[in-house]
């Protein structure tokens, strides 16, 4: 494939280190310079710089956010300066590149269509996907992929994610993370994923989550969120996602949190309680107290003396049509043995 992430990353970090070492003994860099260095290292941009993604051979869609980490920081060419990446064919455009070709099996990337087609035909992940199966239903399979074992795969996945999550910054310390990737059962094409920090002092059960554009509006986000809480439940911890959430992430979480709270209060363990505390709700749902409070406010179901109005919950359920299908995850398909 045309680009090696490790080469691009090394080129970027070495240039940053060179600038820092070259300034040793001089005045400290200004806040503006520090900001520029941060943008170079994490690829943070205020506007889109790649117009569209060719994802596999037959999927094409626009990017949502810009990212500089695909490019040499000085030439703005794809990869490091010694490669022959092409600038955007659109002159005087905001875009550094018109089309980025991304393998839908392994997320390796190039700006050369011929090389891309050749890679896709022989990509090993087309025939053997990485990771270990942790959930397998007739519809969907979730695999755990360790960043320490599949470093390049996970780095390329994180790079791709930066084009669709505005708060996704880290992409190179993947050995500290596990990635839970969802596939259609029987397929080798990833549809989305969430990552989990292995050394989270806040005991977060999710670092970031993304369903890839071609597979959105299928309920896969709710499936992965529910799975992340199932992992926490098996670990015996009250947990939740890393904050801040992206705007789309917050929408997904509020829907899941609303469903789980409604179920426990209307049909579940707390249905016959005259009074419940925030701690009760936290224990039975696995949600953090702050997330419980946020969701109850979102449901607009808190009345005088902090009473919970069940009619408000039933109204929400009627509006969203979720009462007949409370959960997407089925325990009988879990394969969690470690």
From Swiss-Prot:
Coiled-coil boundaries: none
Occurrences of domain MYST-type HAT (ranges): 45-338
Segments forming C2HC MYST-type zinc fingers: 100-126
GO cellular component assignments: chromatin; chromosome, telomeric region; cytoplasm; NuA4 histone acetyltransferase complex; nucleus; SAS acetyltransferase complex
EC number of the protein: 2.3.1.48
Result after altering residue 106 to L: Loss of function
One record GO biological process: subtelomeric heterochromatin formation
Gene designation: SAS2
Protein name: Histone acetyltransferase SAS2
Top-level EC class as recorded in UniProt: transferase
Pfam family, one: MOZ_SAS
Catalytic reactions on record: L-lysyl-[protein] + acetyl-CoA = N(6)-acetyl-L-lysyl-[protein] + CoA + H(+)
Keyword tags: Acetylation, Acyltransferase, Chromatin regulator, Cytoplasm, Metal-binding, Nucleus, Repressor, Transcription, Transcription regulation, Transferase, Zinc, Zinc-finger
Family (UniProt): Belongs to the MYST (SAS/MOZ) family.
Biased composition regions of type Basic residues, renumbered to the chain: 16-31
Subunit-structure text: Interacts with CAC1. Component of the SAS complex, at least composed of SAS2, SAS4 and SAS5. These three proteins constitute the core of the complex and are sufficient to acetylate histones. SAS4 is essential for HAT activity of the complex, while SAS5 is required for maxiaml HAT activity.
Sites of N6-acetyllysine modification: 168
Main localisation: cytoplasm
Region feature Disordered, mapped onto this chain: 1-31
Domain of life: Eukaryota
Consequence of gene disruption: Heterochromatin spreading downstream of the silent mating-type locus HMR.
Function statement: Histone acetyltransferase (HAT) subunit of the SAS complex, a multiprotein complex that acetylates 'Lys-16' of histone H4 and 'Lys-14' of histone H3. The SAS complex is however unable to acetylate nucleosomal histones. The complex is involved in transcriptional silencing at telomeres and at HML locus. Also involved in rDNA silencing and G0 control.
Post-translation changes: Autoacetylation at Lys-168 is required for proper function.
